[in-house]
Curated annotation (Swiss-Prot):
Source organism, top-level taxon: Bacteria
Protein name: Small ribosomal subunit protein uS2
PANTHER family per record: 30S RIBOSOMAL PROTEIN S2 PROKARYOTIC AND ORGANELLAR, SMALL RIBOSOMAL SUBUNIT PROTEIN US2M
UniProt lineage: Bacteria, Pseudomonadati, Spirochaetota, Spirochaetia, Spirochaetales
Family that this chain belongs to: Belongs to the universal ribosomal protein uS2 family.
GO cellular component terms, A-Z: cytosolic small ribosomal subunit
Species of origin: Borreliella burgdorferi (strain ATCC 35210 / DSM 4680 / CIP 102532 / B31)
């Protein structure tokens, strides 16, 4: 069972938004307060977003579909791959190729090409061709693998898509919306939550925050066959908990990762 506490969110720096001047007005309903020119997100609404997303993911998995993990920014790339692999789900963590969803059949042809090249490497085919040809094929394989490895086994369109940083992954969002694929995303204070089906208000830059959210989605997948899902524990109110956290230290970490 996944157990989420308000304190775990605070310790991961989930509550830190961007500088006040970078606010997307559509995020106002998710703002708790302002500290030192930094917006603080309402963690009660973060918890609700987690709960809604957890339930959506479990419905998708029970329907026999997959959740596509997407996060190509530096802070998210490794985490996205790790958690997607842990839950045996497809992922995109290098670059979103236009048409990955909206032109799925063409993308699948590229995937088949990648699989063919990988097969040639191990079935003895490379032993029968020149070193120059091997070099050319290896370059082609590496180029394809860089962007397609995570979706090699995604034979059909996903039942949902989980995104870190919707501003960066706008093309993925546009394609998912066009195909009516539900979108789950961490939405920071500079994001538009209105294009997301299940927005989770949170810090999408701090590594600990990204890791926490991605793990929650992965846990939801792994626990989809259990009757008891997520448990949210709030043993202290948000204001009291914030006093226990060294805001100055968390803030400096968060700002450094954002480059602000």
């Amino acid at each position: 069972m996944a157990i989420i506490t308000m304190k775990s969110l605070l310790e991961a720096g989930v509550h830190f938004g961007h500088q006040v001047k970078r606010l997307d007005p559509r995020m106002k309903r998710f703002i708790f307060s302002e500290r030192n020119e930094i917006h603080i997100l309402d963690l009660q609404k973060t918890l609700q977003g987690i709960k809604d997303s957890y339930e959506l993911v479990q419905r998708v998995i029970k329907d026999g579909k997959k959740v596509l993990f997407v996060g190509t920014k530096k802070q998210a790339s490794e985490i996205i791959e790790q958690e997607a692999r842990r839950s045996d789900m497809p992922y995109v963590n290098n670059r979103w190729l236009g048409g990955m969803l909206s032109n799925f059949n063409t993308i699948r042809k590229s995937v088949q090409k990648l699989k063919k090249l990988e097969k040639m490497e191990v079935d003895g085919t490379f032993d029968m061709i020149s070193k120059k040809e091997i070099s050319q094929l290896n370059r082609e394989k590496s180029k394809l693998a860089k962007n397609l490895t995570g979706i090699k086994d995604m034979e059909t369109l996903p039942g949902a898509i989980f995104i870190i940083d919707p501003k960066r992954e706008q093309i993925a969002i546009n394609e998912a919306r066009k195909l009516k694929i539900p979108i789950i995303s961490v939405v920071d204070t500079n994001c538009n939550p209105d294009v997301i089906d299940c927005p989770i208000p949170g810090n999408d830059d701090a590594i600990r925050s990204v890791a926490l959210f991605t793990k929650i989605i992965s846990d939801a997948i792994l626990e989809s066959d259990k009757e008891v899902g997520i448990q949210i524990i709030e043993n202290l109110n948000e204001e009291d908990l914030m006093k226990e956290i060294e805001i100055k230290n968390d803030k400096s970490d968060s700002i450094e990762e954002r480059g602000e």
